């Protein structure tokens, strides 16, 4: 196991919450390295927490421990869990769907229900609203520092018993592909879909082709345009839209140096559908 501990939350950095998690981790061991995935997730957005783990975990060394705290049910009877993925990474999080994308795309080998009474920061028994510090950062640091074995965090539970959000698969037919807009490339407003590049290749769509892009919200068409399938943003003029391959080798839709989401009022989630087909030659 490595000595990396990577933190994710919806806490932001405007108060001391994240710093307190760092402090607890380094009190457990000053031999670990604590890093941030993000703390800018919108409050209570479990879907985004799940996706950001999927986006990031596999690029860290095996044995890295992740702590994800987007926890609207903190203090309730929801479970606290730790998982070992098939890629060899550990994730500690509330059992509220935060592992949905990891379970679906990467696979989870083992899950432990953390004993919140025994496995928590000493003298924190009266605190019921900051498990991110008292349970997750504390146990994540112990795991990263090799001060506790994964199996000793609590009781093993069935992988299929954990909470999971609905994840839809992209589909294709002989001349088109359809998928969901999973998430935004948040700072730039680009759309990230669940459509793999392989689907476009199977239709013999290559860079330089024009595509008919149609977007639906709750089955109502809200956008349609003919857009170039570009290798990079530089392949189109500033202000022009493009279809491109994102860093997960899925299909994205963007505007060069502008926000596609803001310009066209496009959101994300399973009720946002995108349809791509090759535009007819003129």
Question: Model-predicted segments: where are they?
Answer:
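Alpha/propeptide regions of enzymes that mature by internal proteolysis
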Residues: 2-70, 142
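Active-site histidine-anchored catalytic micro-motif
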Residues: 28-34, 48, 60-69, 75-135
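Pepsin/retropepsin-fold aspartyl endopeptidases
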Residues: 263, 268-282
């Amino acid at each position: 196991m490595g000595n990396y501990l990577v933190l994710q939350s919806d806490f932001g950095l405007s108060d001391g919450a994240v710093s307190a998690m760092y402090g607890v981790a380094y009190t457990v061991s000053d031999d670990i390295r604590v890093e941030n995935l993000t703390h800018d997730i919108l409050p209570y957005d479990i879907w985004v927490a799940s996706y950001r783990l999927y986006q990031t975990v596999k690029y860290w060394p095996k044995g890295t421990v992740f702590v994800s705290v987007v926890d609207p049910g903190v203090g309730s009877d929801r479970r606290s869990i730790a998982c070992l993925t098939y890629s060899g990474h550990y994730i500690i999080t509330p059992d509220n769907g935060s592992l949905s994308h990891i379970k679906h795309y990467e696979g989870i080998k083992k899950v432990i229900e953390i004993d919140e009474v025994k496995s928590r920061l000493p003298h924190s028994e009266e605190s019921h609203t900051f498990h991110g510090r008292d349970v997750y950062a504390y146990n994540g640091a112990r795991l990263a520092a090799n001060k506790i074995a994964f199996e000793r965090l609590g009781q093993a539970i069935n992988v299929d018993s954990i909470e999971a959000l609905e994840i839809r698969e992209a589909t294709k037919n002989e001349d088109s592909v359809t998928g969901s807009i999973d998430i935004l490339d948040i700072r730039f407003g680009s759309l990230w879909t669940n459509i793999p590049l392989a689907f476009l290749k199977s239709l013999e769509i290559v860079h330089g082709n024009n595509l008919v892009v149609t977007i639906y919200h709750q089955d109502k068409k809200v956008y349609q345009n003919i857009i170039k399938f570009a290798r990079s943003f530089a392949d189109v003029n500033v202000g022009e839209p493009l279809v491109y391959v994102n860093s997960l080798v899925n299909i994205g839709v963007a505007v060069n140096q502008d926000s596609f989401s803001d310009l066209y009022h496009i959101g994300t989630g399973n009720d946002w559908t995108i349809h791509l087909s090759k535009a007819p030659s003129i």
